[in-house]
Amino acid sequence: MTSIEIPDNVTSLGEYAFFCCSGLKSVTIGNGITSIGEKTFYGCVELTTITIPDGIISIGYSAFEDCNLTSITIPVSVTNIEGRAFWGYRNLKSITYEGTIAEWEKIVRGDNWNNSKLVVHCTDGDINIE
């Protein structure tokens, strides 16, 4: 499987749903999703970019661990990013956040949610994460 489109009538992506789907390159997440579960995309090494739609509230533990993400867009609806969500490959250099710096600072982020230096691009400026 190289691509997947999750329809709008699906409300959550369960734990391990696409675990180690090494050939998965493209994911379109429907607007009905409110959470991405633990290790949902863990080990999807061909997945390089993803846009998380508005309405997602939580990104689970290790949800994108060991993916080869280079960029990700996170909506202002996200209030929780659990530990190791973007852990693994160090190619993730930027996050586009669709809210302000103050809104980004309010997001609950678990320990080791990310392991690389990156820039979070907010609507009112950038944040450098070491």
Predicted regions, residues:
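Structural signature of tandem-repeat unit edges
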Residues: M1-S12, S22-S35, V45-S58, C67-N80, ...
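A structural signal for leucine-rich repeat
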Residues: W87, I107-N112
